[in-house]
Amino acid sequence: MVSFRAFTVAASLFATLAAATPLDTALPRAADQCNVSNQQCCNSVQQASSGPAALILGLLGVVLQDVNVLVGLDCSPITVIGGGNGGCNASPVCCENNSFGSLISIGCVPISI
């Protein structure tokens, strides 16, 4: 659980980095239009403004234009090797920005696999 002090530090850092270049987080029109490389299996999906997501985004120096966009936390790519469900036992999503490794994926929409 994120402590109040860690959240306060992250919020301060987030405010300090507000001058950084905004990230484009456009969402796909429909889940069936999701590029295979954008399909992720995330242990948690929440709004970017939520405590844990805001903390991670702040520490990474990421400034979003829309703080209500969905982000995935602790994600891994969905592969067909995992079986009929694509190997996802958590939340399957299509995310526009997966450039932060498994830590966080930005601009996510739920998909059915």
UniProtKB/Swiss-Prot annotation:
> Where's it found, cell-wise?
Secreted; Secreted, Cell wall
Disulfide bond entries = 34-94, 41-88, 42-75, 95-108
Task: Classify the main location.
Answer: secreted
Keyword field contains Secreted: yes
Q: Which residues are glycosylated?
A: 35, 97
Q: What are the GO cellular component annotations?
A: extracellular region; fungal-type cell wall
Q: Which UniProt keywords apply?
A: Cell wall, Disulfide bond, Glycoprotein, Secreted, Signal
According to its UniProt record, which protein family does this protein belong to? Answer: Belongs to the fungal hydrophobin family.
| Role summary | Aerial growth, conidiation, and dispersal of filamentous fungi in the environment rely upon a capability of their secreting small amphipathic proteins called hydrophobins (HPBs) with low sequence identity. Class I can self-assemble into an outermost layer of rodlet bundles on aerial cell surfaces, conferring cellular hydrophobicity that supports fungal growth, development and dispersal; whereas Class II form highly ordered films at water-air interfaces through intermolecular interactions but contribute nothing to the rodlet structure.
Name of the featured protein: Class I hydrophobin fvh1
